[in-house]
Amino acid sequence: MKRGYEVLRDPHLNKGMAFTLEERQQLNIHGLLPPCFLGQDVQVFSILKNFERLTSDLDRYILLMSLQDRNEKLFYKVLTSDIERFMPIVYTPTVGLACQQYGLAFRRPRGLFITIHDRGHIATMLKSWPESVIKAIVVTDGERILGLGDLGCYGMGIPVGKLALYTACGGVKPHECLPVMLDVGTDNEALLKDPLYIGLRHKRIRGQAYDDLLDEFMEAVTSRYGMNCLIQFEDFANANAFRLLHKYRNKYCTFNDDIQGTASVAVAGLLAALRITKNRLSDHTVLFQGAGEAALGIANLIVMAMEKEGVSKEAAVKRIWMVDSKGLIVKGRASLTAEKTRFAHEHAEMKNLEDIVKDIKPSVLIGVAAIGGAFTKEILQDMAAFNKRPIIFALSNPTSKAECTAEQCYKYTEGRGIFASGSPFDPVTLPNGKTLYPGQGNNSYVFPGVALGVIACGLKHIGEDVFLTTAEVIAEQVSEENLQEGRLYPPLVTIQHVSLKIAVRIAEEAYRNNTASTYPQPKDLEAFIQSQIYSTDYNSFVADSYTWPEEAMKVKL
């Protein structure tokens, strides 16, 4: 146990002025703090006052990250006190701005920075990390950060923010989490010329050297932390994201949140929307604006969900259309990847989205191309003309990249649009006086619960069924009252409860399918998982002190 000033410098131990007099004396920190004794609730109040005083979200982000650096328990107590308020600061959309200005926002290193020049020594670098038990890793190479492109080493803000939500939303213990940046360079010329840039100053290394780095990283992680260590891939470029997922998914405990997490939360929204449209998913025609990893991930999970309804895979695929930067994806068109070819249908080539919507007449329109304003007034009005209750998902992040706003959707569909977005939007009051609360299809509904469940039961491989199960659980948590208010997702204030339900369902299915490795199987899974959840309350550091009977300490001659 640390003593003296080291206690105050360790964010895992530091309680600030919440240390009692007895703790201060026993830990040799009496006199190193003002003679004031505050409860954690007062400390939260103090942080909130400072938070409200700031006018920019980037400054608020820096305030919260600085708190995380000095008092971890208080940081998570603040986050969980109002998750709806703080999630947009520690994650999307503010984390995107923080990543763009990471050189300015950088205060203290968090996580592990591994570069292409460290090949052959990654196992040694992992030993530098102070924690020997790691259950979850979020790793990025910074090539496709949100909808912002190649941010190189500045992308470290994403794994840091993601793991903060593992804890705040899912209760995964923060000291068992590790953010990792794999720095192979950047093709962003502005960053290469930026004197504040904190990463390698050369073009991205690709090819065999890149693959060798990834292989060594995966082997080193599992060698040190075990095959059950969850490795989440985050914000890799499309080509690498799919390739690496296919390469590693059956060998390691891994998933890609941009592909599978986004898919799960989108399908959850669709399943909830079906309670409004009163039909089956396989009755719908789905059109995607975008055909990258998010779109393809959602499309593949929709196919799985339709199959579960009893439709053949071929019939399900025919219900899904995609538009990429070159137009409608059709058979015979040039420049199609293997993933895109699956959703290429017999049709004339078309480029203009408005014309495509008129021709395909979709009942579901999903935007994941990070093209702000792509869903024009005409497109939204057409969707309302084709459908009694059109489903419109503008899932691109950050807010500036959203295909349309909630207000535009409701306005141009005469309030009939069923809307969800990737970034938060304010409530919208319709001309009839009814107020709708747009559903935010944030991946935060997915990955914390998935991580908690995977860790709790020791799942070694994460199949697509996990993400369909997760989508079903999320949709089940949406009440009729939520749907009446326009919400397709449970209120964010309930996200910890939702994560627990996801974790329990994942664990139940893992034990039923004999894919769990934590044995014996707990009799009460929910109680067991609840016992694993991180507590934001302070620990007591007062030594366990007691007396013996005086007679027991006497030596008789």
Swiss-Prot record:
Cofactor note: Divalent metal cations. Prefers magnesium or manganese.
Enzyme Commission number(s): 1.1.1.40
Pfam families xrefs: malic (PF00390), Malic_M (PF03949)
Reaction equation(s) it catalyzes: (S)-malate + NADP(+) = pyruvate + CO2 + NADPH; oxaloacetate + H(+) = pyruvate + CO2
Superkingdom in the source lineage: Eukaryota
Residue numbers annotated as active site: 91, 162
InterPro entries reported in the protein's UniProt record: Aminoacid_DH-like_N_sf, Malic_enzyme_CS, Malic_N_dom, Malic_N_dom_sf, Malic_NAD-bd, Malic_OxRdtase, NAD(P)-bd_dom_sf
Positions of NADP(+) binding: 144, 258, 290-307, 397
PROSITE patterns: MALIC_ENZYMES
Subunit structure and binding partners: Homotetramer.
Similarity section: Belongs to the malic enzymes family.
UniProt name for this protein: NADP-dependent malic enzyme
Organism: Anas platyrhynchos (Mallard)
Organism lineage: Eukaryota, Metazoa, Chordata, Craniata, Vertebrata
Gene: ME1
